[in-house]
């Protein structure tokens, strides 16, 4: 499908017409009413490692403010609540509240191994969070969240050929102040977020913030000798920051930690109706018969120091961080009970669809040891001269162990009966530079260059083959030492048509280091994906309209990724393998708009179109393994839509869209505020839409997620000049239910989206 061609001028006029009609009419008939209508605040972003007005940055950036985060987090949701809230962003997880996977413009990674890498970088308070155990840190007491689309390979330290999610927490200040935000909702969920800022002296200030999120179990398992209740969690996080500031020096010191206990994602056997992507008849959220155990724990911590020395015309930055984590997740991957191969009755059955569990699959994966250390030194100009520059060096070191376990579901206590282990030591260093030059007051050009050197030292071994005696049938050890170097660059230009409107263009390259898939618990080999390289071209506009009561940004883009790293399943084995596609291409556009449409009404609209395609006629994969069990039960398995590959049991994926990459994503909010009595009533509704997408590399009727529209509603009343507020909220207010992910090696096992939640909030500021 060709990408629609729409000019920036037409887009600006269309959005302006759609949003501020009432305001424009009021201006024409009553100019004096103009002073009664507030204006949109300027958006300041730091994606260029400088604090700049959004209109002056030649990047496609969306910013999410702290007020919006309060709304999305109301019901205790985790980082996945940001999915679809800005254009071209998708976030999902097969592990629940941990191990989120990010996709920008369709580029992401579906790998569920705990050593997986991702093409979307996550930067939390200027520190790269590389491991999957670090990426899901709770989002609380934030100043701002930014999504930087497209390759960010010159200024940010690790794999980011698709983009960067940048989280910036609120920093210590000079006033004694704070807040407490308490929410209570369905399933006895509690969401408590609090922060206090304390000035300690003329030079020192401190900010302490924390969050507690908990929920009772909402899913019951009626079978004995297994986990009885699931989907509950207890998630706690704390952040302590101390800021020291004198003339010529600033030091920001941070300690943060997370402690999570709960259950992993509930995999539900045979809930996809064969021949469709519908839920089976008789599906129930609260009913989950399984013969396995389910638990999940995560502890992580970070100590960091961000230092700045100011000199004549320049500043030196040092960012030092040490991260560590321990993670464990166990679940019943087959999603049901019994085993046809074992002669044990299997299920559950649903009306019109008999269950099939060929074999049990109860596994666990853990990270008993993770140590990440990073260091960045950055020297950059601090003048108002036409030429601005940045020079820096970066170092990354990660030491990681990944354990994989298998369990016997049919022995008393479900004892362990399999084990494999991976070790990895990853090191990377880079030098980088960036310049920004004002050719004229209206035309500014930027250029960046980065050299990166990556090395990994990896080993994996299976010391206990499932179903056999330990240390008898040892497989491995396997060793790998991939390494690569890369030059990344970008060129950009920003031209101000006037004070309200700017045009920008950017060409950029991105790079992801080689990846290793060493999940050898069910396989006898490891796989290595070569480094991937992306080239992206984009252009757009940013405009403030109608006396700064409306704002719109628009971007058109096209990218190509060579040697794209993909994760392929292994048929009827609970195993992944890494492959490189010769090429993948994507193109589309994004629109981000906000407007004050009347004195008491505000609205936002985000829209993105992403057309992605794998281009490799020689690439083929094994599709759903459950289709191979026809001898156990006729008509089982999925209906594959791709053409057969060159080998029996394979299909070609040439021309397929990238997995988990919806073509259309849009979001819309409408906010009404009015004074009542001595306070203010606020009503806010927000809606997010995702188009259909393939769950895997291949296409199958059952494994194509439906398009989804989910909405939220919040009604609040604040008084005492905003010091106090009470509110009621609901998320997924239509209770839309559908399969959003699946397990394809055993049966038609699915993962379902979160059901409707609701509750009340009370917030106090001081």
Q: What are the residue ranges of the model-derived segments?
A:
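Structural signature of Gram-negative outer-membrane beta-barrels, strongest in the C-terminal barrel
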Residues: 243-245, 379-382, 394-396, 422-559, ...
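N-terminal Sec signal peptide and the immediately downstream disordered periplasmic leader
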Residues: 1-75, 80-85, 197, 251, ...
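Gram-negative outer-membrane beta-barrel transporters
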Residues: 390, 445, 558-560, 580-697, ...
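Membrane-embedded beta-barrel scaffold of Gram-negative outer-membrane proteins
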Residues: 304-333, 494-496, 502-512, 530-608, ...
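Outer-membrane beta-barrel domain signature, strongest for Gram-negative TonB-dependent receptors
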Residues: 227, 231-389, 396-398, 551-553
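Acidic, small-polar-rich N-terminal luminal/periplasmic segments of exported/outer-membrane proteins
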Residues: 39-175, 539
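Outer-membrane beta-barrel translocator/receptor signature
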Residues: 100, 117-119, 131, 140-149, ...
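C-terminal beta-signal and adjacent terminal beta-strands/loops
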Residues: 687-697, 717-766
């Amino acid at each position: 499908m060709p990408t629609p061609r729409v000019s920036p001028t037409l887009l600006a006029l269309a959005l302006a017409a759609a949003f501020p009609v009432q305001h424009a009419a009021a201006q024409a008939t009553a100019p004096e009413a103009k002073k009664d209508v507030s204006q949109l605040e300027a958006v300041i972003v730091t994606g260029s490692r400088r604090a700049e007005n959004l209109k002056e940055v030649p990047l496609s950036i969306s910013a999410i403010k702290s007020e919006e985060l309060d709304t999305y987090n109301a019901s205790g949701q985790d980082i996945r609540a940001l999915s679809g809230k800005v254009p071209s962003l998708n976030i999902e997880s097969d592990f629940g509240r941990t191990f989120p996977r990010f996709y920008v413009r369709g580029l992401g990674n579906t790998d569920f191994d705990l050593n997986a890498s991702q093409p979307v970088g996550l930067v939390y308070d200027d520190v790269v969070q590389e491991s999957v155990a670090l990426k899901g840190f709770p989002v609380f007491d934030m100043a701002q969240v930014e999504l930087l689309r497209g390759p960010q390979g010159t200024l940010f330290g690790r794999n980011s050929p698709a983009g960067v999610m940048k989280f910036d927490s609120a920093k210590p200040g000079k006033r004694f102040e704070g807040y407490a935000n308490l929410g209570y909702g369905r399933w006895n969920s509690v969401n408590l977020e609090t922060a206090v800022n304390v000035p300690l002296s003329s030079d020192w200030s401190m900010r302490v913030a924390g969050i507690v999120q908990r929920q009772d179990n909402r899913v019951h398992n009626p079978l004995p000798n297994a986990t009885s209740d699931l989907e509950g969690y207890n998630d706690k996080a704390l952040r302590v920051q101390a800021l020291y500031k004198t003339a010529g020096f600033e030091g920001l010191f941070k300690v943060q930690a997370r402690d999570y206990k709960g259950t992993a994602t509930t995999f539900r056997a045979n809930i996809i109706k064969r021949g469709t992507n519908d839920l089976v008849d008789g599906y129930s959220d609260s009913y989950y018969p399984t013969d396995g155990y389910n638990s999940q724990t995560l502890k992580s911590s970070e100590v960091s120091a961000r230092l700045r020395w100011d000199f004549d015309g320049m500043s030196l930055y040092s960012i030092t961080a040490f991260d560590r984590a321990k993670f464990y997740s166990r679940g019943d991957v087959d999603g049901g009970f019994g085993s046809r191969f074992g002669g044990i009755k299997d299920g559950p059955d649903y009306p019109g669809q008999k269950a099939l569990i060929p074999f049990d699959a109860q596994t666990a994966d853990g990270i008993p040891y993770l140590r990440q250390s990073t260091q960045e030194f950055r020297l950059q100009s601090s003048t108002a001269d036409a030429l601005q520059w940045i020079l820096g060096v970066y170092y990354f070191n990660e030491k990681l162990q990944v354990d994989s376990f298998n369990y016997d579901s049919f022995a008393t206590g479900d004892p362990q009966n399999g084990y494999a282990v991976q070790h990895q030591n990853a090191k990377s260093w880079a030098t980088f530079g960036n310049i920004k030059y004002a050719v004229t007051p209206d035309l500014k050009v930027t250029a960046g260059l980065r050299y990166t050197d990556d090395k990994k030292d990896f080993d994996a071994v299976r010391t206990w083959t499932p179903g056999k005696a330990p240390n008898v049938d040892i497989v491995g050890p396997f060793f790998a030492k991939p390494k690569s170097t890369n030059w990344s660059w970008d060129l950009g230009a920003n031209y101000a048509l006037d004070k309200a409107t700017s045009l920008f263009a950017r060409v950029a390259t991105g790079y992801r280091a080689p990846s290793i898939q060493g999940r050898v618990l069910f396989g006898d080999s490891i796989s290595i994906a070569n480094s991937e390289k992306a080239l992206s071209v984009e252009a757009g506009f940013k405009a403030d309209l109608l006396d700064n009561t409306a704002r719109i940004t628009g971007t058109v883009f096209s990218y190509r990724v060579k040697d794209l790293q993909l994760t392929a399943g292994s048929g009827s084995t609970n195993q992944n393998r890494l492959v490189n596609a010769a090429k993948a291409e994507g193109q589309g556009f994004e629109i981000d708009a906000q407007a004050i449409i009347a004195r008491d009404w505000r609205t936002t609209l985000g829209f993105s179109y992403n057309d992605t395609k794998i281009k490799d006629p020689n690439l083929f994969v094994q599709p759903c393994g459950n289709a191979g069990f026809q001898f156990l039960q006729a008509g089982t398995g999925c209906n594959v839509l791709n053409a057969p590959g060159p080998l029996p049991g394979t299909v070609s994926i040439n021309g397929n869209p990238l997995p988990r990459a919806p073509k259309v994503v849009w979001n819309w909010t409408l906010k009404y505020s009015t004074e009542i009595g001595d306070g203010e009533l606020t009503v806010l509704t927000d809606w997010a839409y995702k188009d259909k997408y393939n769950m895997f590399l291949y296409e199958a009727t059952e494994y194509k997620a439906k398009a989804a529209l989910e909405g939220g509603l919040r009604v609040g009343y604040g008084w005492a000049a905003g010091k106090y507020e009470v509110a009621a909220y609901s998320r997924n207010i239509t209770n839309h239910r559908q399969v959003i992910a699946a397990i394809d090696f055993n049966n038609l096992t699915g993962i379902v989206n979160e059901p409707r939640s609701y509750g009340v909030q009370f917030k106090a500021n001081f």
